[in-house]
Amino acid sequence: MIYLETSALVKLIRIEVESDALADWLDDRTELRWITSALTEVELSRAIRAVSPEGLPAVPSVLARLDRFEIDAVIRSTAAAYPNPALRSLDAIHLATAQTAGSVAPLTALVTYDNRLKEAAEALSLAVVAPGQAR
C-alpha cells in the first residue's frame, strides 16, 4: 500500500516542480494499492480551490483511485495521543490513518511533501517519500 497525503495529491492535479517525479514514482508501483484518509475528500477539494480552481473537475477522478479510510475511534484516539505539539490536527489524522492501515497490511510508503508530517512519520519508523523534492 501507498498512503498519499493531500500535499502529494495536489501535485497530481496542479503542475508543480515535483509533479512529474511523483507521477513516475507512482507509475513504477502500479501493483500497490493507493490509500488515504476520508479527510482527503474535503482537504483536496479545499486545497485545489485555493491554489488552482480550474483543477476542481479533476478531483473526483483522483479520489476515485484511492481507497479511503474512515476516521474511526481508533484513528481519532491515535491522532489525539501523538506527543509532538508541532503536529497539526489534520496531519495527525493522516499519520494515524497511515499507521493504522500499516498495522493491517504492509505500508510501502507515506507520500507527503509536508515537513512536519514527514518528521512525525519518520519518528514512528514509517517509510516516507517525497519524489522530486530536493533534500
Curated annotation (Swiss-Prot):
It comes from the Bacteria. Gene3D superfamilies: 5'-nuclease. The keyword Nuclease applies. One of its GO terms (biological process) is negative regulation of growth. Keywords: Hydrolase, Magnesium, Metal-binding, Nuclease, Toxin-antitoxin system. Mg(2+) binds at E5, D91. The keyword Metal-binding applies. Its EC number is 3.1.-.-. Residues 2-123 form the PINc domain. Its cofactor is Mg(2+). One of its GO terms (molecular function) is RNA nuclease activity. Disulfide bonds: none annotated. It is an enzyme of class 3 (hydrolase). Belongs to the PINc/VapC protein family. Toxic component of a type II toxin-antitoxin (TA) system. An RNase. Upon expression in M.smegmatis inhibits colony formation. Its toxic effect is neutralized by coexpression with cognate antitoxin VapB35. This is Ribonuclease VapC35. It comes from Mycobacterium tuberculosis (strain ATCC 25618 / H37Rv). The lineage of its organism: Bacteria, Bacillati, Actinomycetota, Actinomycetes, Mycobacteriales. The gene is vapC35.
